[in-house]
Amino acid sequence: MKNYALIGDIHSIYSRLSQALTYCEHQDLIPIFLGDIFDSRCSVSDSVGVYNLIRDAEKKLNAVVLQSNHQNKFIRYLKGHKISANHGLDVTIEEFKNSSIDMNELLEWLDNRPYGAVFKDKDDLEYRCAHAYFSSRIEVPNYEEIHLIHSNQLNKKIKNVMIYGPVNNEGRIEWWKTNKKHHYKMVSGHYHKLIIEDHCLILDGECGDEGDHVFLALYDVNKKLLKKFF
């Protein structure tokens, strides 16, 4: 059986990503990136380096990269839509403009990443992964090894919930506090939190923010082991 590593928000921090991928290679893990791979909000940023590392991990380690809110905004920029280039996106744009990366190829790659991933661990526990929230409205068929959920399987409302998370009139819904009665484990990044419980994993060590407390989170699924890369 294949073993997976769930990797939280990266936000253009090359050194931590490199450490995480070295761990995956040594432990024979398939990385599943939970999104927000670009847009650093600190003084360190290498969006192009992160992109190249991830593309290499796709080839060598069969890595999976999920859609997210930050990537969605970059996609809209690359398609020519008017957006506010803030929260680190301005840095990402500038770094790619000053690189040799083909922007059309970059757009095609970003636009074709799946919104969700479903797989089982060695104990037959199912993991349902999305950047912010795996909608219960998604029907998961029988599958072998891993099932990916792509854009053409979803309507706009569900896509938005998967990359931004559910909201109500009072704001963001903290779904992990109430949504505990299901036979699978929900996995996300996005929330600037680290939560490891029987019913959910939230893996966002605030990588890309300033401070000594921030880290890139990796969860080795079969070992049930959290790794922090500083």
Predicted regions located by residue number:
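A general structural motif
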Residues: 1, 26-30, 60-62, 124-126, ...
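Short, solvent-exposed loop/turn segments at secondary-structure junctions
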Residues: 12, 38-39, 71-72, 133-137, ...
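N-terminal active-site segment of His-dependent metallophosphoesterases
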Residues: 1-51
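His/acidic metal-ligating clusters that form di-metal
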Residues: 102-194
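Active-site neighborhood of phospho(di)ester-bond hydrolases with catalytic His/Asp-centered motifs
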Residues: 7-8, 31-35, 64-69, 130, ...
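A short acidic (Asp/Glu
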Residues: 17-18, 42-46, 75-78, 132, ...
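Active-site neighborhood of divalent metal-dependent phosphoester bond hydrolases
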Residues: 40-128, 151-156
